[in-house]
Amino acid sequence: MGESALEPGPVPETPAGGPVHAVTVVTLLEKLATMLEALRERQGGLAERQGGLAGSVRRIQSGLGALSRSHDTTSNTLTQLLAKAERVGSHADAAQERAVRRAAQVQRLEANHGLLVARGKLHVLLFKEETEIPARAFQKVPELLGPEDQLVLGPDQPEDEVGESSEEEPVESRAQRLRRTGLQKVQSLKRALSSRKAAQPTPVKPPRVGPVRSSEGPSEGQPAAQPEMESELETALEPEPPQPTKEDPEKPVLQIESAA
């Protein structure tokens, strides 16, 4: 390109083979200088363009690096989210299994409760004493019994059977238990009545001049009425013999005795 611009062309003014004038040489040098200046300007513009392209390329490379880093961060976040989702799924499956098991247990409990309610074969027998009885009275009956207590026992139960401990006879019948509680009630009432009699002081009455039949009448009838009251209490507290009942072998019977 430079060589073609520097090639001198034919000068029409000068004849071929004639002498070259100085003016022609000067004009040719001026043209050459202007061409060189234009070439330098073009080279500077090309260098500036090349620098701009290099800057844009560097900016593009930095953008690509940031994009790759953000892509790596996003991939790591997605991996963590997937792991958390798997853990949550496993926990949800375990919770669902537990809920199913609990629902089955609740259904079984409801069925058992309905069956128990439908049967209604649970009976609770409560024995409550009016006076406090020691716990040893349930294990062994006192050996010394009065004649009245022996009459209440009757011929069905000998004294040897009453004196046996609970260790020798762990299983007691219902009739024996009722009879024993009745005897304990009678004994407690007798002790209460005897203590009440001993605590009451005999009032001292002043002597009267008139007839004493009206005043002595109630005092003579009072000790006669006292044994009658004791006999009535004994007959009322005497346990009735148990009647034979047909018990269902499948029916559970719960007996609770309270000494309070």
Swiss-Prot record:
Species the sequence originates in: Mus musculus (Mouse)
Post-translational modification comment from the UniProt entry: In vitro, phosphorylated by PRKCD.
Name of the featured protein: Caveolae-associated protein 3
Expression sites (tissue/organ): Lung, heart, skeletal muscle, liver, brain, vascular and urinary bladder smooth muscle (at protein level). Strongly expressed in uterus, ovary, mammary and epithelial cells. Also expressed in spleen, intestine, kidney and testis.
Domain of life: Eukaryota
Induction info: Up-regulated in serum-starvated cells or during cell growth arrest.
Chain segments carrying region Interaction with CAV1: 135-200
Gene Ontology biological process: circadian regulation of gene expression; cortical actin cytoskeleton organization; negative regulation of fermentation; negative regulation of phosphatidylinositol 3-kinase/protein kinase B signal transduction; positive regulation of ERK1 and ERK2 cascade
Lineage: Eukaryota, Metazoa, Chordata, Craniata, Vertebrata
InterPro entries linked: Cavin_fam
Record's keyword terms, sorted: Biological rhythms, Cytoplasm, Isopeptide bond, Membrane, Phosphoprotein, Tumor suppressor, Ubl conjugation
Annotated region (Disordered), positions in chain: 146-260
Location in the cell: Cytoplasm; Cytoplasm, Cytosol; Membrane, Caveola
